[in-house]
Design a protein with these regions (language model features):
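Histidine-centered catalytic/metal-binding microenvironments
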Residues: 200
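Hydrophobic pocket/interface hotspot
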Residues: 185-189, 195, 214, 274, ...
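A conserved amphipathic terminal alpha-helix motif
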Residues: 288-317
Length: 317
């Protein structure tokens, strides 16, 4: 899992650098990348009042201060306003030598909290300074990070919802923290255009213009499903549920899979509770359920992080 987390983290750092048209990823982008991906480090920072938005603001302020020290003004040409990465032409992944060293040394097998501790201990003091300007005591934070749970957050087997799927079926649940406002998280999850980011592999599927009719290809076999969603409030949380139904064949019109997201406000961001349910068709489906369950475990981790990156890119700050 550490390789997957490293890929998500460095990809998020690349996005953060691209937003401000920076040619090389540096320590501050790695810090923002941890917040964009979400997880334990972002959750702990949120409890200290740090969000992705506030951290981006502190990084920008630090850059302006550095320019002022050199006698330069932070004009639009020197410090361009941030843009969504999807609006930019991406440069190749390039990083400073110290950023490369940090990525190689960060003990991601222990999770994002351990990676954050590595950034705080980095000799330049970049992240320590950003934390101080955000009102956080770095030494106190280091103590808290040392006792943080490892990652990824556990995926647990739960009872499936019989109102969404007929038997036989199974379900699993994942809790994940995102350093973004809950309304933006719910908007992103409810957007059919973003299904390709987390719900299916766009390299192995074709979709219609609505983004809700998906034709999956596995070797010589294909299956077409139609996705639709509901969105409602339950207490203080928003609940977005996507249901995929078989579009053709003997089981046409029957539900195959659901993803239920409970989106709740948390300090500095959002606590996301994702339950994925899968129907097992016939003897073959029941025989392959354990393997499908394993893939869903990996897929749910990936989906949570991908949603985090998409929401982070939508934030203007």
């Amino acid at each position: 899992m550490s390789m997957l987390l490293t890929s998500r983290w460095t990809g998020a750092a690349h996005l953060e650098a691209a937003r401000t048209r920076t040619t090389e990823i540096d320590v501050d982008h790695l810090y923002l990348g941890l917040l964009a991906v979400g997880g334990q480090a972002a959750r702990i920072l949120g409890r200290h009042g740090v969000s992705l938005t506030s951290a981006r603001r502190r990084v920008r302020e630090a850059l302006i201060d550095d320019l002022a020290t050199l006698g330069l003004q932070a004009t639009g040409d020197v410090v361009p306003p941030p843009k969504a990465a999807r609006e930019l032409d991406f440069a190749d992944w390039r990083a400073t030598s110290r950023a490369h060293d940090l990525v190689n040394r960060a003990p991601l097998r222990k999770g994002t909290a351990a990676a954050l501790a590595t950034l705080i201990a980095e000799p330049s003091g970049v992240v320590r300074h950003l934390l101080v300007t955000d009102g956080v005591d770095p030494d106190q934070l280091m103590t808290e990070l040392a006792s943080a749970p490892t990652e990824p957050d556990p995926v647990e087997r739960v009872a499936y919802d019989p109102s969404l799927l007929p038997a036989p079926a199974w379900a699993k649940r994942l809790r994940h923290y995102l350093s973004s406002p809950p309304d933006l998280v719910a908007d992103a999850i409810a957007d059919a255009a973003l299904l390709a980011a987390w719900a299916y592999d766009p390299n192995k599927a074709q979709v219609d213009d609505s983004g809700e009719t998906i034709r999956h290809t596995r070797g010589s076999r294909t299956m077409t499903v139609r996705a639709h969603h509901t969105r409602r409030r339950e207490g203080e949380a928003e609940v977005v549920t996507w249901i995929q139904e078989v579009a053709s064949g003997a089981h046409a019109g029957q539900p195959l899979h659901y993803d239920r997201f409970v989106v709740a406000a948390a300090p500095g961001g959002t606590e996301l509770l994702h339950t994925a349910g899968q129907r097992s068709f016939g003897l073959l489906g029941r025989l392959t359920a354990p393997l499908a369950g394993w893939f869903s475990w990996v897929g749910m981790q990936y989906a949570a992080q991908r949603i985090g990156l998409e929401v982070a890119d939508r934030q203007a700050a």
